[in-house]
Amino acid sequence: MGAVIALVIGTVPAASAEEKVLNVYNWNDYIGPGVIANFTKETGIKVNYDLYDANETVEAKLAAGHSGYDIVVPTFVPFVARGIEAGLYAKIDPSKLKGWSNLDTGILAAMAKNDAGNQHAVPWIVATVGLGINVKKVQALLPNAPLDSLDILLKPENAEKLKACGITMLDSPSDVIPVVLHYLGRDPNSEKPDDLQAATDVLLRIRPYIRKFDSSGYINDLANGDACLSLGYSTDIVIAGVRAKDAKSGVEVSYRIPKEGTLQYIDAMAIPADAPHPDLALAWIEYNLRPQVMAETANAVNGRSGNKAAQAMVRPDLTANPQIYPTPEVEKTLFTGPVASRGYDRLRSRAWTRIKSGT
């Protein structure tokens, strides 16, 4: 990942009075390999870089207060948007960031719906929730598998046949439930109890065939051939394909945006309201607004950058891939997640517990 990596141990290391230390909390495999080391070399700021694999983990730490983190990178909707309402994030003045003009104005406009004036968050990576498929293994068990449809996973007769080669699903109700609602032709932002029950019923019917719910380890499961079908994040699944190719194991992993449409999400940099080093956090944001820096990250994570100026430096195989940079036609089928009320969030979490336990 980078020069200074501190695994999550629940607390952020203390710094001496003399040294400058920035505490960053980000997703696993979500930054260019040289970004941290080069930032430290240029600025003299040491980086403690902790990892998480669920938005809920970040939200809980920030809500508890005194997390010690200066930069976090949660999914903008619903997590940053909800955190803004709760006062969890500090304001960022775009006029003080030289690289702000490098950002994609379309993405900023989408974020402004939940953050007026774009005062709290800076786009990092834009991606989708979709299907990771080992095509050879899937077609061996299901010759006429609908590779471009959620039917491959959500129809029990298909999931039952693919159980033998391994099915995984994101352990994230805020990502999965809206996708299932959209698949059913219902409003993915709905908080109606009967809609939640309908999505729960669909997932309970395929629960016996899901090997595990996981939001990070499935990358290696796909890359190693231990899983043949995953509902996951586009960036993770493309990384799995790259790892499989590099290993020369004969495993091929394909990412597909379902034809029914799916969730598109924006992960964004934000500064916690009680960040101990907000000035260093701004230096980090400014550094990462450079096109060449953000392009390095986009190339490493195989994702779509929120930095428009970086696009010319992103690998052509990524920018030409409609599964990563969707066509206008596909864009029309995508939706952003809801900012769920606290009450609905609790109901959805209870439903998710039922789904995972199969009861």
What spans do the regions from the language model cover?
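Ligand-binding pocket segment of bilobal, Venus flytrap-like solute-binding proteins
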Residues: 165-180, 184-254
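A structural signal for short loop-to-beta-strand junctions that line the ligand-binding cleft
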Residues: 68-72, 90-135
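Ligand-binding "clamshell"
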Residues: 83-91, 109-110, 115-118, 209, ...
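Short beta-strand->loop
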Residues: 90-101, 151, 247-263, 272-275
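Early extracytoplasmic/lumenal segment of secretory-pathway proteins
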Residues: 18-83
